[in-house]
Amino acid sequence: MAGNTIGQLFRVTTFGESHGLALGCIVDGVPPGIPLTEADLQHDLDRRRPGTSRYTTQRREPDQVKILSGVFEGVTTGTSIGLLIENTDQRSQDYSAIKDVFRPGHADYTYEQKYGLRDYRGGGRSSARETAMRVAAGAIAKKYLAEKFGIEIRGCLTQMGDIPLEIKDWSLVEQNPFFCPDPDKIDALDELMRALKKEGDSIGAKVTVVASGVPAGLGEPVFDRLDADIAHALMSINAVKGVEIGDGFDVVALRGSQNRDEITKDGFQSNHAGGIFGGISSGQQIIAHMALKPTSSITVPGRTINRFGEEVEMITKGRHDPCVGIRAVPIAEAMLAIVLMDHLLRQRAQNADVKTDIPRW
């Protein structure tokens, strides 16, 4: 299966399935001499892992990461870093009844069309469980970006269903189970989730991720534009059906005089572009949003077919998230970090000696 690797100089390759023995990844391109321990990776894994809230799947995986290679005496060696997380709470029997049935809205049908077979246990390779390794790899990138360049990457939920959320307090994000930055909406989110669990249904969400302190000049013309690579990375996350950079689709209703980010001697006067012009970072905050569909793993009956072409009624059993967008926040942060680290290394490799007299803010 191709398509398991992202990045050029900072490269992340993941492997593993939802109900396999383990998940793993190989991280190439990490510079030597960076202090790194398993504890550095565990914080973000704990933010993503299942079973930590009554609002997410009750599959209880500790997601304890092991560093297998690339670190000696507490620092990176510059060689490939191997990471592994063992699966410990698989309940494959939950899926035995659907081994011949295509769950509507899932990858069951398309995987079988492509490969002629599929791992029906929890979706196999198509499961969001795979993203645990992205978060582990992304934690390496976040540490490097923060310590070497002062870059901070933060994400939060900015909409669930028809409930929009304002970014009022970043410190609140880690203090509630929704990654919600809006203290006035937490009760409404709680009420919605309770209703969904009672109905056996699910809901979509919007996640916003912001990178601060990114230097100007990252990104490559034409096909490796920074925003193109960010969109690619975020779109690769399970259930994501749309990505916006900056004002995104809202620019359709704006005029050029409103949308252009004017510059004065004091700096940029707005950031409609999300910190990227011509595919290259401007030094402003990089802002991206992603829309996640409601999961199709619900107990509301739905129509589908089996592999013999017969129509059947489908009710999903097992342990699932009523809103997959909640746990997507640390995944979005990880993917943005991976892209930024890759482009920083590429910029240093080609343009390390470039200096300009143009102001930077």
Curated annotation (Swiss-Prot):
Question: What is the name of this protein?
Answer: Chorismate synthase
Where does this protein come from, organism-wise? Shigella flexneri
Annotated InterPro entries? Chorismate_synth, Chorismate_synth_AroC_sf, Chorismate_synthase_CS
UniProt-listed PANTHER family: CHORISMATE SYNTHASE
Sites binding FMN sit at: 125-127, 238-239, 278, 293-297, 319
Provide the organism lineage as a comma list.
Bacteria, Pseudomonadati, Pseudomonadota, Gammaproteobacteria, Enterobacterales
One matching Pfam family is Chorismate_synt
Query: What is the E.C. number?
Result: 4.2.3.5
Keyword Translocase set for record = no
Reaction(s) the record says it catalyses: 5-O-(1-carboxyvinyl)-3-phosphoshikimate = chorismate + phosphate
- Gene behind this protein: aroC
Q: Which PROSITE patterns match?
A: CHORISMATE_SYNTHASE_1, CHORISMATE_SYNTHASE_2, CHORISMATE_SYNTHASE_3
What subunit structure does UniProt give?
Homotetramer.
